[in-house]
Amino acid sequence: MDALTELAEEHADFVEKLSELEAALDEMMGTHSASDEDIELVEESVRFFEQELLPHFEREEKHLLPALERKIGRFGTLVNVVAYEHDEIRREVHKIKEALAALQAKRPAPHLAEIEELNRHVVFTIQFLWDHFRKEKTSLFATAREVLSPEELESIGVHLSG
């Protein structure tokens, strides 16, 4: 499997996790309450972001983006857009952690405002990630296949699998 296919398949795994998180937030919004199971699922999602998603971004930034930058430049290109989006998602993961901590501190007292704040950040992050993954699949990876040689793609794959 080549490097770009590997990255795209990781995206598919991430979408499944995002769907689980979205379902938990929908339940919390519908019931105006966060159960222990809901909190556990959000905590698991935060761990997933930190242990799977953000390292995925770091691998792209360390191996794929520099190779593309050498070919097409950075500013005004997809390289810059993708790097910016990675930073934005990192900021949102931090905001999700803060909102989760506020929710946990408020329970078991009424905590709808905290659920709404958590929901706001989670919904933004999920929508942003879906768009980000689509952009990488349809634009960034296509550009990489056009401008990088088979040897460069193979080298990226070796480093990604590292």
Q: Whereabouts are the PLM-identified features?
A:
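Small-residue-biased structural context
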Residues: M1-G162
